[in-house]
Amino acid sequence: IAACRVCLVEVVGKEQLVTSCNNKVQEGLEILTNSPRVRVARKQNVQLILSQHDFKCATCVRSGNCTLQTLSNDLNIIDLPFKERVEHAPWDKNFPLIRDTEKCIKCMRCIQVCDKVQGLGIWDVTSTGSRTTVNVKGNRKITDADCALCGQCITHCPVGALRERDDTEKVWDAIADEKKTVVVQIAPAVRTAWGEAMGMKREDATVGKILDAWKRMGADYVFDTSFSADLTIMEE
């Protein structure tokens, strides 16, 4: 894509630095990936990205698992020599997919995966110059864009600009409300893989433990949605 310019490398014999992500390796090339020129250019590019990024890491869903955060630490960035300017755009917070324009770093990965892999073309570049950002193609609302909610753009976003809507607090509020009956549905993917996140062996991560955990938290009923999940997979 060569949008972020963070992957710059130095090719011996060439005057200009080149992006490694979209240049093919050829026989006989001598490539320097960590030369003084590369380090200076890479640091400046990351600083430019940060100057247009809302880096409230403590409240970001990607904190601790953020490519930009890792790069900033690796390049020893402790201040910004550029004026900070963060763009804001409204978004429907009720939609399952949440986009935070203030955190977008214009890497264009969401555009590429949605267009070339999923074939949907939901995202596109909007505005120009320093106001350039990514938004729904054609200035449409996301609810009118036929988004399949596949989640690929969230997976490929290196920061917290794209994420799933978090309804955790709504769940706790429902459990605390004695007038409500809380019904939990567990998909087969969760049933079979939840133990990995807990560092448990497969034979120890039983369905019964999921049931027990939800009942202890306050759920009234717990069901497996394998049938409806199969239908969803067929539709996708």
Segment roles from a protein language model:
Residues I1-N34, V38, E164-E236:
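Iron-sulfur-associated redox domains of electron-transfer enzymes in respiratory
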